[in-house]
Amino acid sequence: FAPANNDEQGAASKPAPTSSPAADGPCNVKVTDTSSTPKVPSDLTWKTGQEGLTWPVSKSVGPTKTVDGFDACFARSPLGAALAATTAIYDQYGKHSAAESLNFYIADSTGKKKSLAVAPEQSDPEQMRSSGMNPAGFSIDAFTKDRVELTLVYSYPSSSTGYYGMPMT
């Protein structure tokens, strides 16, 4: 997945393909597992950001490239979508601000403009760490080549179940 430029389509529209070199060539990541319950790839590791926050990445599923300084290019698969969504959220705890991360990862839309308007200048990694919130898994609700609906699952000790689900499209 690569950011899409589809500003006229509104907040709930599906992303349009981009014509950037990143999307046309280098982001063509080989898909080996299209299951909604994929096997963990042998190259899955954890990227470390500020204050020791970590999130999963895979050299084979994504991110496989850097585009404009951002981790990009994920397999068009359920696991690729989950890793892309997690990377988009956690990138703000790496070398980019929350606004920079949102600007890169969210498709151009009314929703993007609203998100950027309320984005903090800098995210607080200590707040995330102290809450005990960590990536724990994902659930695929719907998947096609061009659109995915998923729920990222986080451990969250203060919740009634110990987990928190974040739905995304």
Put a short name on every predicted segment.
Residues 48-120:
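Core segments of small alpha/beta cavity-forming domains
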Residues 11-13, 81-85, 148:
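Small-side-chain structural scaffolding
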Residues 5-6, 28, 91, 103, ...:
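Detector for Asparagine
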Residues 97-169:
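Structured, amphipathic secondary-structure segments that form assembly/contact surfaces
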Residues 2-76:
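Juxtamembrane and targeting peptides
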